[in-house]
């Protein structure tokens, strides 16, 4: 899996397009960096840049952006609605793919140290990179903002993590760190700034102080007014959207606004958003309104509508959802991007990958897809109207499993490649040999994990498949018969792939546990597939 880190530096300039463009060029021209989004606001006088790349590349991209800003931004003249303490106010590094939080912490440390040494400016570490608990919170570090820095820097407790304890009027100070995806989500109100801020105080985790905490965990919020849009916003930062999601913030804001007789007129997402954040919101509205939507495209459209994400500007999923901008692998590497004819030809070529693992995953994925098809061929038809509620329940697991199993086609090939890469590591010194041995064992565990995940995924489908065999559209009987055997075959392939990769694993307890589990899953697949076929034959008779 290719490594990918997201960097989202916030610069204190949102009006001067020449400055905004110069910083954009500094990032875009950095080898290995892909600039995904530039979001500027005149009222906030702030621009948020989003770019991705390998860990070492995004550090260089952030430094190049800072160098450009150092020549062009003068904080002594800066005014804006958004809290800030420096020309490069905050620079977080965020794991996207194949990267741990610890690696992002190292990115923040490397960036902070080099920035301080080169430009001679104070740099603080926050979030997961913070060296003390008191510096984990960005608002706590920003307290008093730029204007308070001259006095704060004189105090020992506010000594920067890197750079001088000296005030640099043109720059201020920079905060660098590592964190999860932060969603900047603003809800639009036709109200005053004060009314929006009142709602923000009730919702944000900090609340109005220690004695009056807010309702929403992992949420920061303030109220402000956007002159260019002639409306107010409850401006929020969702620090962990898996704790408090977009829909929760929006619905709670609507409830507060209703109590104050204030109209909510949509919302705004600043920067990029993970697909999961939108799908979580879609799941909420589907459950709330008893909706049946399978396709991500439809679910995203629902969320855009319910949250009013296009109220201030068009919301274009292909340009705003990070997974759509940065696919797992390029078309030249991904088996999934290749035509079926090419995939089959590569399987038959003189190469170990793609091999049985990828074929097993593809076979199981098609089995799940066939089951989904049978459900959809039953759902929504007048003659099967009495089964609509049942199909709404049965179809989604097959649809989701088909997508997951499809992704394992590439995952299996990547796992094998990781093992081959470990085989090529040097073994000249004892340290080299130890590193190589550890990498080989990790590669084998990955090679075991993929087919095991395949078998576990198929196992979760058998109850639904049994029920579908009893009530699905009988005209699709052969499709369901093939589905059952395809799923069984997928597990059959997974079983032998697990065993062959377990052979060289040195952890005996792990080997015994996995061998027992995969054997159980294979036996279950044989039994369940036979039962599905028997039930279909009985219905025919």
Swiss-Prot record:
A molecular function GO annotation: formimidoyltetrahydrofolate cyclodeaminase activity
A single cellular component GO annotation: centriole
Region (Cyclodeaminase/cyclohydrolase) residue spans: 335-541
Subcellular location: Cytoplasm, Cytosol; Golgi apparatus; Cytoplasm, Cytoskeleton, Microtubule organizing center, Centrosome, Centriole
EC number: 2.1.2.5, 4.3.1.4
Region (Formiminotransferase C-subdomain): 182-326
Pathway(s) annotated for this protein in UniProt: Amino-acid degradation; L-histidine degradation into L-glutamate; L-glutamate from N-formimidoyl-L-glutamate (transferase route): step 1/1
SUPFAM superfamilies: Formiminotransferase domain of formiminotransferase-cyclodeaminase, Methenyltetrahydrofolate cyclohydrolase-like
Catalytic activity: 5-formimidoyltetrahydrofolate + L-glutamate = N-formimidoyl-L-glutamate + (6S)-5,6,7,8-tetrahydrofolate; 5-formimidoyltetrahydrofolate + 2 H(+) = (6R)-5,10-methenyltetrahydrofolate + NH4(+)
Region annotated Linker, chain positions: 327-334
SMART domains xref list: FTCD, FTCD_N
Residues where folate binds: 163-172
Keyword annotations from UniProtKB, A to Z: Cytoplasm, Cytoskeleton, Folate-binding, Golgi apparatus, Histidine metabolism, Lyase, Multifunctional enzyme, Phosphoprotein, Transferase
Record keyword Methyltransferase present: no
Coiled coil regions in record: none
Residues that bear Phosphoserine: 520
Active site feature: 82, 412
Region described as Formiminotransferase N-subdomain: 1-181
Subunit text: Homooctamer, including four polyglutamate binding sites. The subunits are arranged as a tetramer of dimers, and form a planar ring-shaped structure.
Known role: Folate-dependent enzyme, that displays both transferase and deaminase activity. Serves to channel one-carbon units from formiminoglutamate to the folate pool. Binds and promotes bundling of vimentin filaments originating from the Golgi.
Family assignment from sequence similarity: In the C-terminal section; belongs to the cyclodeaminase/cyclohydrolase family. In the N-terminal section; belongs to the formiminotransferase family.
Protein name: Formimidoyltransferase-cyclodeaminase
Upper lineage: Eukaryota, Metazoa, Chordata, Craniata, Vertebrata
Gene responsible for this protein: FTCD
């Amino acid at each position: 899996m290719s490594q990918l880190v997201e960097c989202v530096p916030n610069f204190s300039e949102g009006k001067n397009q020449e400055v905004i463009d110069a910083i954009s060029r500094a990032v875009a021209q950095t080898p290995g960096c892909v600039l995904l989004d530039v979001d500027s606001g005149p009222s906030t006088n702030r621009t948020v840049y989003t770019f991705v790349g390998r860990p070492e590349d995004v550090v260089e991209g952030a430094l190049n952006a800072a160098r450009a800003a150092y020549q062009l931004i003068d904080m002594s003249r800066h005014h804006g609605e958004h809290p800030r303490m420096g020309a490069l106010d905050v620079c977080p590094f965020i794991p996207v793919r194949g990267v741990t939080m610890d690696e992002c912490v190292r990115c923040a440390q490397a960036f902070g140290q080099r920035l301080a040494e080169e430009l001679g400016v104070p740099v603080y570490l926050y979030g997961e990179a913070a060296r003390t608990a008191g510096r984990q919170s960005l608002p706590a570090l920003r307290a008093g903002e730029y204007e308070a820095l001259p006095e704060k820097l004189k105090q020992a407790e506010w000594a920067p993590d890197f750079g001088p304890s000296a005030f640099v009027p043109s720059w201020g100070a920079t905060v660098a760190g590592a964190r999860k995806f932060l969603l900047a989500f603003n809800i639009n109100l036709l109200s005053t700034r004060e009314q929006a801020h009142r709602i923000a105080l009730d919702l944000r985790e900090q609340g109005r102080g220690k004695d009056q905490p807010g309702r929403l965990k992992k949420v920061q919020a303030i109220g402000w007014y956007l002159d260019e849009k002639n409306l107010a916003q409850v401006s929020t930062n969702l620090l962990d959207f898996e704790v408090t999601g977009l829909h929760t913030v929006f619905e709670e804001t609507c409830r507060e606004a209703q109590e104050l007789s204030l109209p909510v007129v949509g919302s705004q997402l600043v920067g990029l958003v993970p697909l999961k954040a939108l799908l979580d919101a879609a799941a909420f509205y589907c459950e709330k309104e008893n909706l049946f939507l399978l396709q991500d495209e439809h679910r995203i459209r629902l969320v855009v509508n319910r949250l009013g994400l296009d109220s201030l500007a068009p919301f274009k999923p292909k340009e705003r959802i990070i997974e759509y901008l940065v696919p797992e692998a390029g078309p030249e590497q991904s088996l999934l991007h290749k035509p079926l004819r090419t995939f089959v030809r590569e399987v038959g070529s003189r190469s170990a990958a793609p091999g049985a693992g990828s074929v097993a995953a593809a076979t199981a994925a098609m089995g799940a897809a066939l089951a989904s098809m049978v459900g959809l061929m039953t759902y929504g038809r007048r003659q099967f109207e009495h089964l609509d509620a049942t199909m709404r329940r049965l179809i989604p697991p097959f649809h989701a499993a088909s997508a997951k199993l499809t992704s394992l086609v590439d995952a299996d090939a990547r796992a094998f490649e990781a093992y081959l890469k470990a085989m090529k590591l040097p073994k000249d010194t004892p340290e080299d040999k130890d590193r190589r041995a550890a990498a080989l064992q990790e590669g084998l565990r990955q090679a075991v994990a993929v087919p095991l995940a395949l078998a576990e995924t198929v196992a979760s489908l058998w109850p639904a498949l049994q029920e579908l065999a009893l009530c699905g559209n009988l005209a699709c009987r052969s499709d369901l018969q093939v589905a059952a055997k395809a799923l069984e075959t997928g597990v059959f392939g997974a079983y032998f792939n697990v065993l062959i990769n377990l052979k060289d694993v040195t952890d005996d307890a792990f080997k015994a546990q996995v061998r027992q589990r995969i054997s159980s899953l294979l036996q279950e697949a044989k039994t369940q597939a036979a039962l599905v076929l028997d039930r279909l034959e009985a219905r025919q008779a």
